[in-house]
């Protein structure tokens, strides 16, 4: 088994930047919890019936890929596990080997690190096919290394398989909620619709870069194509298309990963398919080729066991602690998925950047709320002032003139004073306005009628003016 990518900080950073922190944590926690490599899981042979069924669903439609997740009970302690069974993905129009960039080289290196970490090889991989790798290709090829335990993962293919109900997500938040640990890859590819349909021995997953409204006829078509007993039967000793699959042995089991253009673009455009030897000798993943490694097929019964004492209770407590930590991480990741769905303009996909973007977004929203509240109060004041304009009466006399201003009480500056006086049964019988150098002095002559003292009335007037 090759070196795990998370054992080297540079490799881990490279992988995390390409597939996302959630997927990186998922791979690490999966390897730590079960210690089950992909080489132990059942890898179905490249059967034409299954491949033709997947191709039939994708070609001539708006779906961009189709995956078959095979339900396999490899280890009774792990329960049912959904692993890659087969797949088909179309190539975008115009994708060619000439459009090659440094990012494509990084993607290939990440795929190689994943292959070495979960399949393993002591020999060098050599690149036999160059060219551009789109984000759709990267999502499709990286999915080869994912597996989903049905007893712990209640989302994605495992959630569909356990519930037995199809799932159709036709918006970005719902798609990200389904993909979860693959959400970084899905967002990069730009998926708008995902369909997950449970069948007899697994789950068929379809994804599209377009928005596709829910159509029950599509679900029925998938069930009719993949729901028959002539397809995969996954049991303790799985058989695929009537062929006995052995978890041991040295025969290579090839998986065809085909990329084909859309039907309407077939004329004058062809691209060779990629053979993926997922598990076994002469492994080749998207142009990477490795030597034979017969030890990958050892089952639990064939592996040499170390002699020694039985594990103490402390070992079980440690395993329980690992499981609790895994569940805690999963719940935390769920919160991040929900946060990512509601925060716009995410700068980066890592958790630290997501939290920083969320804080910035919330702060901006609080500022906008304060501005809106202030504008609302100003508008109310303007509306109240525009209800009834003040009336001006001008009278000319022999030696002088009299100017009389009248306006509604609620719009007058001393309206609060008058209202407070009325509430305390104090009626002003005379008032006078005097102009000084510093302002205006409004004098009221009062005639107390209630039991309110002068000091109490003063406090109430000050309180009303301070509001």
Curated annotation (Swiss-Prot):
Keywords: DNA-binding, Nucleus, Transcription, Transcription regulation. SMART domains: HLH. Gene3D superfamilies: Helix-loop-helix DNA-binding domain. One of its GO terms (biological process) is regulation of DNA-templated transcription. It comes from the Eukaryota. It is found in: Nucleus. GO terms for molecular function: DNA binding; DNA-binding transcription factor activity; protein dimerization activity. Its main location: nucleus. Induction: By UV treatment. InterPro entries: AIB/MYC-like, bHLH_dom, HLH_DNA-bd_sf, MYC/MYB_N. The keyword Transcription regulation applies. One of its GO terms (cellular component) is nucleus. It holds the Pfam family HLH. Disulfide bonds: none annotated. Residues 316-365 form the bHLH domain. Homodimer. This is Transcription factor bHLH3. The lineage of its organism: Eukaryota, Viridiplantae, Streptophyta, Embryophyta, Tracheophyta. The gene is BHLH3.
């Amino acid at each position: 088994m090759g070196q795990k990518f998370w054992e080297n900080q540079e490799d881990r950073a490279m992988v995390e930047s390409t597939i996302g922190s959630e997927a990186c944590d998922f791979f690490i926690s999966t390897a730590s919890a079960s210690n089950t490599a992909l080489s132990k899981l059942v890898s179905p042979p490249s059967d034409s019936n299954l491949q033709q069924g997947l191709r039939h669903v994708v070609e001539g439609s708006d779906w961009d890929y189709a995956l078959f997740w095979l339900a396999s009970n490899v280890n009774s302690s792990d329960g049912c596990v959904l692993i890659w069974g087969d797949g088909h993905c179309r190539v975008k129009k115009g994708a060619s080997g000439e459009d090659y960039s440094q990012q494509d080289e990084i993607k290939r290196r990440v795929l190689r690190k994943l292959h070495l970490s979960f399949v393993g090889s002591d020999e060098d991989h050599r690149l036999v096919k160059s060219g551009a790798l789109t984000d759709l290709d990267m999502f499709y090829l990286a999915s080869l290394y994912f597996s989903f335990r049905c007893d712990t993962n209640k989302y994605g293919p495992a959630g569909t398989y356990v519930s037995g109900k199809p799932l159709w997500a036709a918006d970005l938040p719902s798609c990200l909620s389904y993909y979860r640990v693959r959400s970084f890859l899905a967002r990069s590819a730009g998926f708008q619709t995902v369909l997950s349909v449970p069948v007899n021995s697994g789950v068929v997953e379809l994804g599209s870069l377009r928005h596709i409204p829910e159509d029950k006829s599509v679900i029925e078509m998938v069930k009719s194509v993949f729901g028959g007993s002539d397809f995969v039967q996954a049991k303790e000793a799985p058989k695929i298309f009537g062929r006995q699959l052995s978890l041991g042995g040295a025969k290579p089991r090839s998986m065809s990963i085909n990329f084909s253009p859309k039907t309407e673009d077939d004329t004058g455009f062809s691209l060779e398919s990629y053979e993926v030897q997922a598990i076994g000798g002469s492994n080749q993943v998207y142009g990477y080729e490795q030597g034979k490694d017969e030890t990958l097929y050892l089952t639990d019964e064939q592996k040499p066991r170390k002699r020694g004492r039985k594990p103490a209770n402390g070992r079980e407590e440690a395993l329980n602690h690992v499981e609790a930590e895994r569940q805690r991480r999963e719940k935390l990741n769920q919160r991040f998925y929900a946060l990512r769905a509601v925060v716009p303009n995410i700068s980066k996909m890592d958790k630290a950047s997501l939290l920083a973007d969320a804080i910035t977004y919330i702060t901006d929203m609080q500022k906008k709320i304060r501005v809106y509240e202030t504008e609302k109060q100003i508008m109310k004041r303007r509306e109240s002032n525009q209800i009834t304009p003040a009336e001006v009466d001008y009278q000319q006399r022999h030696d002088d003139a009299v100017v009389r201003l009248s306006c509604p009480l609620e719009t007058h500056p001393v309206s609060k004073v008058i209202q407070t006086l009325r509430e305390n049964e104090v009626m002003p019988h005379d008032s006078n306005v005097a102009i000084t150098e510093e302002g205006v002095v409004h004098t009221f002559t009062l005639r107390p009628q209630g039991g309110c003292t002068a000091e109490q009335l003063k406090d109430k007037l000050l309180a009303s003016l301070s509001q």
